[in-house]
Amino acid sequence: MDIRFVLPSEVEQLARNVVTSFPSKTPAALLQNMEGELHRPDEGRYLGCFDDDGTLLGSILMMDFTLNVRGVMMPMGAAAYVSANFLHKKERVACTLLKVLMRYYAKQGTPIGCLHPFNPAFYANMGYGYCNENYLYQPKPSAIRSYGDKSGLSYARPEDRQEILDFYRAYAARTHGATVHHYMDPHRIFDMPYVVVCRRDGRLTGYFTFDFVAVDHYTDMYHDLLVPEMVYED
């Protein structure tokens, strides 16, 4: 067994492992950028577990974040797309990779590790615990109050990009539990189809992103309005 970073020539094995592990949750952009990431990592580095024949048994995306812990910005090592070869499930490949990842970050002096668990009990056995809660609100549109004045709202322009990023990172610097990632932050915000900003006297005071999600009512007239991110200061 060999544990090392995945090579660009092994991208097909890596893509197959990720898709068979997350068949409905693998973003198309992740697959499109995968080979480029193996040449020049931006989002993170893919660590792989190989057998003696060079078959990829499992993989994990190692990502470097900065996390606000009660006002102190700390480095954090994150695990994403923990994937096992479909023909090698239940062989503790994922467990082995996570242990290697945790030892790596411990040697780097990184005090915090995180991941988004498919099964919290599975990762609890490795020392992971719960962090801040993630709330999902589902109000009816009729329950959203209108204050009449929307003059400060506008769709974000390309020239607003850096100002919005600076606004988010200032928010992250004062908010416990917020994270910063040089690659993920702009993609999380600007890969959304709609970004709206709020200005007061010309100064940015907030922004949110949104999209329309189809609801299966056998007609294209029904949609949910999804707002994954809303950051504001007033």
Which residues are covered by each model-predicted region?
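Extreme N-terminal starter segment of soluble prokaryotic enzymes
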Residues: 1-3
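A short, well-structured alpha-helix characteristic of acyl/acetyltransferase catalytic modules
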Residues: 8-20, 159-170
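Active-site rim helix/loop that mediates acceptor-substrate recognition in acyltransferases
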Residues: 22-68, 173-195
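Beta-sheet entry/capping signal
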Residues: 46, 59, 76, 111-114, ...
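Conserved beta-strand in the GNAT
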Residues: 48, 55-65, 76-78, 83, ...
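Conserved acetyl-CoA-binding loop-helix of GNAT-fold acetyltransferases
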Residues: 81-84, 90-103, 233-234
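Conserved active-site alpha-helix within GNAT-family acetyltransferase domains
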Residues: 107-111, 117-135
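Amide-forming acyltransferase catalytic core, primarily the GNAT-like/NAT-type
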Residues: 134-233
